[in-house]
Amino acid sequence: MFDYLENEEVALDELKQMLRDRDPNDTRNQFKNNALHAYLFNEHCNNVEVVKLLLDSGTNPLHKNWRQLTPLGEYTNSRHGKVNKDIAMVLLEATGYSNINDFNIFTYMKSKNVDIDLIKVLVEHGFDFSVKCEKHHSVIENYVMTDDPVPEIIDLFIENGCSVIYEDEDDEYGYAYEEYHSQNDDYQPRNCGTVLHLYIISHLYSESDSRSCVNPEVVKCLINHGINPSSIDKNYCTALQYYIKSSHIDIDIVKLLMKGIDNTAYSYIDDLTCCTRGIMADYLNSDYRYNKDVDLDLVKLFLENGKPHGIMCSIVPLWRNDKETISLILKTMNSDVLQHILIEYITFSDIDISLVEYMLEYGAVVNKEAIHGYFKNINIDSYTMKYLLKKEGGDAVNHLDDGEIPIGHLCKSNYGRYNFYTDTYRQGFRDMSYACPILSTINFCLPYLKDINMIDKRGETLLHKAVRYNKQSLVSLLLESGSDVNIRSNNGYTCIAIAINESRNIELLNMLLCHKPTLDCVIDSLREISNIVDNAYAIKQCIRYAMIIDDCISSKIPESISKHYNDYIDICNQELNEMKKIIVGGNTMFSLIFTDHGAKIIHRYANNPELRAYYESKQNKIYTWKYMILFPNAIVKHNKIHKNIESVDDNTYISNLPYTIKYKIFEQQ
């Protein structure tokens, strides 16, 4: 009988005959099945009368077989294409619904005939809808992944214990999933995202004749039950970001899924692919889009609800591979949006001038904001700067950018040392070729600058910034271009003080001192030095320079410094006084070494015994650097002039002039 029930088309009369001498509750078979188990396992079990007969014959509807399944559990666990509602009801009624939780809701949902009335019966008699399947999906999660979920059944599930608002079990604060991104940075989203994610993903490539496409009514139903469409999954994707990959995109569904998303053009870099991702970025990228052609109405919708930076990030990576589509998109934008996108592009991206040209063609302009943006771009290059300044006219460099000097952005350290120095410079040699990208860019911009000493909101000049960021080549360029070393910032800081306190760069300090700051500037700088012990060498350089200007400055030097360096000041005084006593050709040794006029004429006295004796004595300890450089150069120049005089042909006009006149003629060359 059991074999018959399990494998044959069961006839009532034949079964009645068998039941006369067989016990339907005989469970001595290997599977411990009773007669109900055997019949309900039969793939042809569609006759409710057979079930009623077995029950009337005393078959126990609560007996559990080797799989610990009652007949109802066996029936709803079997791989039947359909679950017969009448059979299920008979089995439930036979136990007074005590076996209701033996009903396998997950298998039932996969059948082709889910009956809302049967679901209502389960609800009415207390079925536990909080149960989860082997894959840890809830009832509602499984149901939305079926072929054609019905909103009314979704309502029943949710209203009777199926939650669609998740809480992380490990989160002691119980933040709902939808609150993750804005309120709890430590919260990790569930792998599958929301129920809305599951529904969209499972119906992306559905064909209407076998499996339904995404149904707007289902989407509305889920949203109405509190699912936030802006929620993201572990891949940081919203449901909309998946939906735009669908084989059939309904713009009304797109609008539903946009709710709560304040920027449909938001973008991010995918960790695995290093590609720019996001709703708009994915849709424009043919690698993520199902359909070949772009729907411009859909793109316009994204543009209307997207922010310029995200739009820029979405279209720029695709420019080189799909110029036609991107140019078409640019053409559809209004000029205000396009202008914002141009500024974002110039500020944050590696510039392709051909893309800029397209933007300009469709209504954008290179204005002051665009130029200011490019000065902040870490991918700056002189060629693009030339192009942009010529388009704008160059006046933008003369206007502060939120209180900052535009060119000053290039002085900052985030542009990298390589932008200012070549390998030669790193090895100790100055690079003054301006071939370095940032330096050459600044060099190109300077002619547009009406006042190289323009100040920012802190009262600082470009020179202040170049010194602060230790850009020696740039400092040299600015000094050669007329930057004033004497300007004080709003807090009283000079470039000299910055070189000592912040840059701690003696070479920079000497460059500044060589451009002859005023005595007041040097004294003010000394007052600003924060550590008079650790900065001893720098302080001595300043004192040495200041005493050349005025050897009576000891009273002006801050008392803390003058006390600490009193012996050094005395030695400076002694050496300077000695140089002032030595007379060479009507000039003091001091004036020949430390004045501009002296530097121009010192070569005339290259053979002067007193000058040579002073040079060869090397008696100075402090003021040696100047004459140790000047005097050898003076000898070389003198010898060159003398050689030129000797080479003049006899019996010429010049040859007949006195030697002193000939000397003055040739020293001009």
UniProtKB/Swiss-Prot annotation:
The keyword Repeat applies. It comes from the Viruses. GO terms for biological process: symbiont-mediated perturbation of host cell cycle progression; symbiont-mediated perturbation of host ubiquitin-like protein modification; symbiont-mediated suppression of host NF-kappaB cascade. SUPFAM superfamilies: Ankyrin repeat (SSF48403). Keywords: ANK repeat, Early protein, Host-virus interaction, Inhibition of host NF-kappa-B by virus, Modulation of host cell cycle by virus, Modulation of host E3 ubiquitin ligases by virus, Modulation of host ubiquitin pathway by virus, Repeat, Ubl conjugation pathway. InterPro entries: Ankyrin_rpt, Ankyrin_rpt-contain_sf. The keyword Lipid metabolism does not apply. ANK repeats lie at residues 31-64, 101-131, 135-166, 199-231, 235-266, 277-311, 334-368, 458-487, 491-521. Residues 586-667 are annotated as: PRANC/F-box-like. Substrate-specific adapter of SKP1-containing E3 ubiquitin-protein ligases which mediate the ubiquitination and subsequent proteasomal degradation of host target proteins. Prevents activation and subsequent nuclear localization of NF-kappa-B in infected cells, by targeting NF-kappa-B RELA subunit to the SCF E3 ligase complex. Interacts (via N-terminus) with host RELA. Interacts (via PRANC/F-box-like domain) with the SKP1 component of the host SCF ubiquitin ligase complex. Belongs to the orthopoxvirus OPG023 family. This is Ankyrin repeat domain-containing protein OPG023.
